[in-house]
Amino acid sequence: MSHANRKEITGLTRMTPKGLKELCKKDKLYQTPRLNDVLYLHYQGFQCIENLEEYTELKCLWLECNAISEIQGLEKLGKLKCLFLQNNLITKIENLDPCRELDTLNLSSNHIRKIQNIGTNILPVLNTLTIASNYLKDSDSLSDLIQCKTLSVLDLSNNRIDDILIVKIFEQMVSLKVLVLQGNPVVSRLPQYRKTLILACKELTYLDSRPVFPRDRACAEAWKRDGYEGERKENNRWKRAERRKTRESINCTIRMRNSHRPPDQQDPLLRSSDSEDDTCTETTRKKVALENDCVDDLWEEVSCEQPISDHGTSTSSSVEDKDGTSSQDDLIAEKLSNRGTLEGRPTVLYENEVSNIKSVNQNIKNFEPRSIETKVFQDVSKISPIIIEEKRVPNINLNNEPSDVKNRKVIKCEKTGYTSTGQVLKENVFDEDAEIKNVEDMVQCQDIIKSNEDMNSEFVVSTKLEKDVEQTCIALRNEAQCKELDEDQSIKEIESKLINEMYENVAADDHDKHNETVDLNLKKTASAQHARTFFFEENKMTRRFYQEDKKSSLLAKSKEEALLEEDCIISNEKCAYDLEEIGRQMEEDLAELRQSTQKLVGFSIDEDADSKTDSEIDEEDLMAQQDPYSPLLQQQFKDRRMKIMLKEETKAQGESIRDLNITLSNESSSDDKQDQLFAKLLDDATENIPKRIFGTGCDSLSSAWPQEECLLQLTLSEVKETPDQEIVFKNSITNSSSFEEANEICVRIDQKMAEEEAALGKLLHDLENEANTKVKHDETNSSKESDAARICTSLLDDIMVELTFNEKRWHEKPKSFKFGPIESDDEFSYSFEPQLEKLVPPALEDPARGKSLRECLDTFSDFVSSMADPKLPLMLGRNPTSGVEKIRAAQELLKSKNLAELYADTAESLNSQVAKEIEKRKRRVAASATRCFNQRDKYDDTLELVQNRLMIVKKDSGDLEELPPPPPLISDTESEDYDTAEDEYTPGNGGHKHTHGSKPQDSKEHLMNNLLKQKQDKPDTVEEVGKKNDHDEDEFYSLEAMTTFGNLDAEFFHKLDLQKVNDSEDSESAINCMRSYNELQAYMKSGSLKHQLNSEDTKMLQTMFSTVASDGKPKLRNPKGEEEDDLLKKMVLRMKEYEEREHQLQLVPHEIPRELSPIKLSLGGSKLFEQKNKIPETGLVHAENELTGNIQFIDNKKTNNDKSTDAIEKNCEPLVKTSCQTSNKSIDDDIQSDVSTDYESGEEVLVVEPPKLSDAVLKSLYSDGFEADLKMVHELEEATRRNLYRYHSNVMHNSTNNHSFSTKKTLPTKTSTSEQSVGAKAKWAKIAERLHEFLDPETILRKEQIGERDACEDSEDEDFAFEENNFEKDEKLIISEEYNSTQNICDGNSGPSKLDGSDQFASIKGFENITEMPTYNMELNSQSKKKTSEKLSNEIENIITTCSSFEAPTDSIGIEYFEDPTLTQINPEGLKTEQIECNLQILNEDGDVVVQELSVNAQVSFE
């Protein structure tokens, strides 16, 4: 079924540009296609996508609900982002490569069976793919989705997918967020469909018809981990977390309301009803744990289960602590619901194994304590308890191994918030002392439970506790430094190293604490007693809180429940008290440990050793005996301590010991500030603790985590020194704001700045020295290089001069011919050069030949690179002249005078010019805008296309109105003297108006001077002519002539296929004319050259020609009045003769022109001649020279006694000029000819018969400027009417014999043949005069549109240029043979009279100035003109045949029939003259019978 039939049957439509524009108009889009970014083509019945090439800016294209079967036609839509192709007939996804920015693709309801060609390599930003309701079936059809790395929305609903392996495909789609699979069989086949897909797609947020919430994902992960039970628990946790969140928001509102009410009117807080059972279970478990003296679970509750509360009041916090309504599940679920701060594990930093406790205890026992007397305990009464919250709790680990009962101690330390490095200490202080805290905190936890009973024993052993704390600090520090010495690269070691450096930096400020007197220790007992009373008060207070909460219980309890709740209340009260005590003890312990560690830095080992008394040494020995550690461990620890002491000796030297006696009042007054600051530090230190995301193993302790997860979750923060904060903390904590302290700080800063300044000065000095040495080195190198460069330049110049000279000499030699091996046997041939591979590449054999220095350097660099990397392509074959030309052009440019003007322009002047141009452009834009605004009312009407014209349709009346004319063009110059081409041309008289003003008639002297100048500058003249020709070729402005004559050109060139020419009797006259091709060209050129000189210039030129011809040198004559009078008289006579002849020709009735028909060309052909010669131009040059010479001989002979020579020679002068002009134009073998006219030399050259046109057609082709041509044509028409139709074929057979050199032909035969040939020539001449213009649209346009150029000067230039060329070519040519043969022709034609010696001499000399010599008179009557034309035609043909006989026995050269419009310039220095001898055969018309044989001797000049 054909395409057209299918279209008719289906009724489908095509996308056409017109239809698309109509749709744009309907949708109120732009009519210019590229301005639209959307296009609505849905519901149109289109069967294919086409004609969208112009819509290059489209971003959205709607094509749904059509009949499109193939994706195509999108090649130009590179910016398309959305393509909607649903409800079509598409079977394959293809041809989307050009749409690289496609984001959304909808292919629903098509016939697609496989997803393909949409990978990231083709559609790199594809985000949404909708491919529902297709024929997708299995995982193979979806396998290409893995390549879609950016696809996040995928709709596969209502397909036929039943393969469960698609889950693996979705698992590999990293960006998939939305997936729609409903309507596929696989939904029912997948077990646990929704959970499976949620687990497979990590980023999935929407599945089928509802979102994927975080709760869904958590339940799915729990189901994967623990089955349905885990899923149920996880679901309950989320539900409780949601209820808890709601309850907390309500309780917060109740608290805000209660804060403004009296206590008796306050509302109770809400409690959880569904978690009562969990609460009872928890309280029972706690009670049992307390009775069994096990606090592991209690500590877990402390570290993990504290309710989150912001910095609220202590009342609300304690109420929340006493609620007891929350469980571990509640808290975890709540944390999970707040995804911003997920905390699935205890917020602890480091947990250590049990062995750490033992090793620390051993280290403590084995180490000798120092400086026990300096231990200071502060008054505890100043310390306010800090409420422990889960976010703020210091992260201290507790290992589940109870310590030995003997080592249980309660440590009460001096609480100080002192720090000197701000943020560094905040982040590190809790992490660094983890081991110490583990030991001490376990001790605290176990002892605080029985704190009421053991309070007295605490104060008894306080001295021992003080020593234990000191030993613990020393042990930690020494152990960390031992690890540093052993270079154990673990996290603990790195942190210890950092904290040691920090302590050393701030050691200088810590000396105020180490020397306090022993009397401060007297405060210990009072402080402890005060603390005990404080604890008991706090205990009572907490009991009251619990009792109040209990009263607010709304439910009635049974007796057992009441008893159980009383036990729970007791346990809760203890727990609350213990929590507060632990928090306070922790802060005191931390402060004491930090202060003790800092004090150690400031001590020197020698002073400590001197300060020890015998009692202290005995006490240390006693302690060492009491410690239960083995002697081996004690010895090892002593060795390590010796290493550390040696290291600290070097560090401690040079540090001065400062003793500041600060009173107890000052200490107590600064305690409040220190407490507040340390509380802030403690809060800030716990802010950056990394939280672990809830996941697998959330309930396990962090000691059981794998090492990789520890590193991921607990990253180390960078330690950065902050000097500004350091100074602030020093001043604020230590209150060292005295004048001396400030002076010391200033001195230290000054010293530091001085050191930095000295270092900078030294660096600057080094840089200056380096720069100076580099400058000196560069100077020495440059001086050396300049010498080398000068030597190389001179050498290269010499080489280049020699090579250039050799190259010139080589060019002057004649071409040599290479012969092959002469011997028969190549193997033993000595003359045959063996084919060996050259070692040096040809491009490097003569690298400097004809090259500049730059090219030589480039060649050398290419050679070096080729040697370094042989795989690189060889770049040595560069054009050797391009660089030279560039250098010469640059030199000429530097010498030009315009550069000075160019450099004279400054930036200001150029900016001012640019500003003027911008201002001018703004004015034009403003004017255009004003014009448009003034006509705004008109443009409310609509534009419609009426009869292929754009018309204005009035909105109110509906009338049609023409468009207003466009505004006149504004010229760039905006000047009134702007000349255009139209100003120069004045139609009507065919003349030209000179653009430089009207020239007066020039005198003879002026004309002669101009001619002499032109002769001297002959090369320039030829170049100018070439330039003028180029200029003429550039002046082509329209293609109308091509459309008018295109068909005729095609027909003409088709008929130029001369193989198809048939010889016929009707074409014999045209064939005869074609033999005198040069005469034909003369006719063609005569019209265009005849009237381009005015009469006065023509007269003067002809007089000068005669003078130059006779004397050989132009003589400057003084103007004489008589000669001028004679010239004027002759001019008047000639004008009268022209008028009479014109009148006679007008009386002759002309044929009535018939209706013009299409121009057709007939075919005809003959063999003109063959030229067997390798010299391309000289043979023809001789032919032209002989031709003009013969014309001169004939005219001289016929008009010896004629006294009106000067007047009549003007008639013949254009003929001679034209023949000379065309001598170089007719044949140029160097220029490649047209394809249709490129003949082989052995083929027969066929001739085109001229077209038979009516006189009306010919006359219509003439322009008004050719009156003189018309006169000659009318005269020739008479001969045509008399002779053309009486022409018989038998005469044509005899015509070829008339062209030979035979002197036996009689005059009457020749005359009759000549008359008939003249008729054909006349007919052909009429056509040929205008044929080249008729076929050349450039000529037509040049003459009709632009106006003819002033061809007078051009013709003079051409004449003299060709005279010089011909003169130089024929300087040494001997014409004896040609002269004799020509003389025979003249004798046979006009009688027995001979040329005398002077005429011979003149004729020989005539070859030197061939075109300067005037031709002599032709009779004015038509009869004499006919005879002359007959003789001329015969002689021309004979001479051409003679010239073609200058041959060498080589391939023949065919003469082409199309003239070359450009001039061929021959260099006279390249000519060579040789004597040649050849045999000449004159053939008949068919070219197969030899009519006559001649032998010719001549001297020939050739290149």
UniProtKB/Swiss-Prot annotation:
UniProtKB keywords: Cell projection, Cilium, Leucine-rich repeat, Repeat
Sequence ranges of Low complexity compositional bias: 1303-1314
Transport listed as a keyword: no
Pfam families per record: LRR_4, LRR_9
One GO BP: chemical synaptic transmission
Skewed-composition ranges (Basic and acidic residues): 1014-1031
Entry's Gene Ontology molecular function annotations: dynein complex binding
First and last residues of every LRR repeat: 34-56, 57-78, 79-100, 101-122, 125-146, 150-171
Domain LRRCT stretches: 185-223
GO cellular component: a single term: synapse
InterPro entries: Cilia_flagella_integrity, Leu-rich_rpt, Leu-rich_rpt_4, LRR_dom_sf
Disulfide-bond pairs as recorded: none
Protein's cellular compartments: Cell projection, Cilium
Compositionally biased tracts (Acidic residues): 973-985
Main location: other
Positions of region (Disordered): 249-280, 305-328, 956-1033, 1295-1315
Function: Cilium-specific protein required for cilia structures.
Family: Belongs to the DNAAF1 family.
Annotated PANTHER family: LEUCINE-RICH REPEAT-CONTAINING PROTEIN 46 (PTHR45973:SF9), PROTEIN PHOSPHATASE 1 REGULATORY SUBUNIT SDS22-RELATED (PTHR45973)
Record protein name field: Dynein axonemal assembly factor 1 homolog
Organism: Drosophila erecta (Fruit fly)
